[in-house]
Amino acid sequence: MRGAELDRACAGLFCVGFHGTAPSPEILELVRRGVYGVILFGRNVESAEQVAELSGALKRAAQRPFMITVDQEGGRVARLRALHGFTEIPAMRVVGREGNPGLAREVGVLLGRELRAVGIDQDYAPVVDVDSNPANPVIGDRSFGRDPELVGRLGAALAVGLQSEGVAACAKHFPGHGDTSQDSHRHLPRLSHAMERLDAVELAPFRALSMAGVASVMTAHVVFEALDPQRPATLSLAVMRLLRERCGFHGPAISDDLEMKAVSEHFPLEQTVPDTILAGVDGFLVCHTAERQHRAIDLLRKAIEEGRVPRERLVEATGRIALLKKFAGDPPDVLQVRERLRATKRPELAGRLPSALPGRDPTAV
C-alpha cells in the first residue's frame, strides 16, 4: 500500500467537522479524499429536513458507506433541538435520579429513532463519566450520577436502546473525565488517582458498556499521572491498553476532538497524530479546520511511510472503523422526515422525565 491508496487509507481513519448547512467545497474535498464520516454541530443545523438533506447529500457524494455523527446527549449537549422538530431530552442526571434501566433504554430508543430519521448514524453518547467532583465544569449533569454501578447500568441500557434503532452508541470519555476540575476544551486536566481507584470508579462503567456491546468508545484528553505523567489518555498507550485489557473492549476507540486546547496547545500535531494511533486509538476526530484536517492526514501518511507507525497498526485501525461503518445507513427520505419525527413522539415518556433548562453547552467552543 503506497501513494494514493495509502493516502485514502489514512484519510479513512478521520471524522471531520465543517461549517455551513449544506456541503461546502472544503468538506466535499475531504469526502473525496476518503474520510469515513463527518460530525455535525449546531452550526450545521437549521431544520430537520435540512439535516436530512445534508446527510443524504454527503452520503451520495461519498459513494460508499459514510458516517454522519453528532453529539446528542440530552440536556446541555444536544445539537438537534425542539425548535428543529426534535424531542428535548433532559440531562442524564435527570434519568439517573429515576434509576430505571428501562427508562434509560426508552430514552436511547427515542434518540435513535429521531437520529435515524434524518440520516445520522452515530451518537457520541452516553456519557459514562462518574460525577464525582461537584466542581467539574464540563461533566456535571451530563453524567447519570455519582455511583459507578448506576452509571454503568443506565449507560448500558441507553446504548442498547440507541443501537436497537441502528444508531451506533459511543461511551465517553475514557478512562473518565468526571473527577477533573478543569475543562479539556480549554485546559489539560490532570488526575493523580491510583490504579485501584481508577479500576473501582472510573473504569467500572466502561466495563459495563463493553459487556453490553457498545459500538465505540471516545477518549478523554486527561493526564492520568499514575499511568503516564507526560501524555493525556488519547496519546497514551499505558492508559489506552486499559480499555482492551481491563474493560474487555475490542471495538473502535475514537479520539475526542484533536483541536481541543488540552491537546492542541500542549502537543504539536506532528506528535499528536502518530502518538494517538500508536496508543491504540483507531479514529481521529478533527472538528473545525480544513487545513488542520488535511495536515493531520498528511502527518499520518508520513509517519507510516517513514516506519514510525507500523502498517499493521493502520490495518488494525481500519478494521475497527469498518465495524463502526456497518451502522452507516442509506440517504434518508427527506419528504418523510416530519412524519417519521411525529411518529417517534412519546408524550408518556416526556411525562416521566421532568424538563429542565439545558444551561450552557460546555462543548460549544
Predicted features, each with a name:
Residues 87, 122-146, 165-169, 173-192:
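Short glycine/serine-rich loop/turn segments
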Residues 46-53, 96-114, 145-153, 196-201:
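Glycine-rich anion/phosphate-binding loops
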Residues 4, 17, 25, 43-61, ...:
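Second-shell residues forming the walls of enzyme active-site clefts
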Residues 29-41, 110, 117-122:
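Catalytic domains of carbohydrate-active enzymes, especially glycoside hydrolases
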Residues 1-35, 246, 265-365:
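Preference for extracellular/luminal or secreted protein segments
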Residues 78-89, 176:
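Short, flexible, mixed-charge acidic loops at enzyme active sites
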Residues 16, 31-35, 88-105, 194-214, ...:
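Structural recognition of alpha->loop->beta junctions
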